[in-house]
Amino acid sequence: MEAIIRTDKLEDLKAALSDNGLVHGMTVSQVLGYGEQKGFTEYVRGQRIETTLLSKLKIEIVSIDEKVDDIVNVIIKAVQTGEVGDGKIFIQPVERVIRIRTSEEDAQAL
């Protein structure tokens, strides 16, 4: 699954995910994007600056199917503010996982 979240919610999310033991790792990437939030306009030294792409974080987590709904609920509870710009969660299947170090596959590789 991928979750696009506000940058200031990362520590809350990390704490929530580690507290319940559902997730043993995740990948975090800085990304830019826009949706309903649309960006903002500010003035710097009298110059109008329009920011149309907002800084967000992309969280990538791979899990067994049985844990997906629980992980989604933890993510929502940890990062939801109720305001435009909270983000999105995308869930897609993963065909195969291989841990490079041990060659373990699928659930054992998670």
Task: Write out the residue ranges for each language-model feature.
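Positively charged, small/polar-rich N-terminal and surface patches that mediate targeting and assembly
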Residues: M1-L110
